[in-house]
Regions:
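Extended basic (Lys/Arg/His-rich) segments that typically form rRNA-contacting surfaces
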Residues: 1-187
């Protein structure tokens, strides 16, 4: 059975395991409920829509396909469906970095800082030849960076607190603190 939940990223911290090794983890608060159930007969596919209230006026909804048909509208989806050691995928909106140059955005090397160079150390260089007389599509240039949907795969669940509905995931997950993320098991 597929496991899935919506959660709010609280931030990162360090915890210690039984072998006294330090683990960098991301804490996620998970409190969501089923808002719609789709079935094969009526809709042509089976899925469960889960919602989570971030503020009083803002509700996030996400549909997870291939979910259990035993769920009903209003059922709570908590962290108790996950187990320590589970591998999950985490999706969310990555951090936006604004307008960035080619060195940060695409990893260009830049020009040498010696041999007569005074300016343009981080310039992109030529953007095309004389003949086509236009810039070719897909040319890597400066522009807006980040702020797109990102999925981190095979992240390990290292701690579950059922009373507080908290989950600790090993490593970093997409988004800023307070962002809504989707957590689901690896197929």
């Amino acid at each position: 059975m597929a496991k899935f939940i919506l959660g709010k990223k609280l931030g990162m911290t360090t915890i210690f395991n039984e072998a006294r090794e330090a683990l960098n983890v991301t804490l996620v608060e998970c409190a969501s409920k089923v808002s719609m159930v789709r079935n094969e007969e009526k809709d042509g596919y089976s899925a469960v829509q889960v919602e989570m209230a971030k503020t009083k006026n803002k509700v996030y909804k996400k549909e997870f396909k291939g979910a259990s048909a035993e769920m009903k509208v209003g059922d709570e989806v908590g962290v108790d469906s996950f187990e320590i050691g589970d591998k999950v995928n985490v999706s969310g909106l990555g951090k936006a970095k604004g307008f960035q140059g080619v060195v940060k955005r695409h990893g260009f090397k830049g020009s040498a800082a010696s041999h007569g160079h005074k300016h343009d150390l981080r310039a992109p260089g030529s953007i095309g030849a004389g003949y086509p007389e236009h810039v070719i599509k897909g040319k890597r240039m400066a522009g807006r960076m980040g702020g797109k949907r990102v999925t981190s795969k095979n992240i390990k669940v290292v701690l579950i607190d059922k009373e507080k509905n908290l989950m600790a995931l090993q490593g970093a997950v997409p988004g800023v603190s307070g962002a809504v993320i989707e957590i689901y098991t690896v197929k």
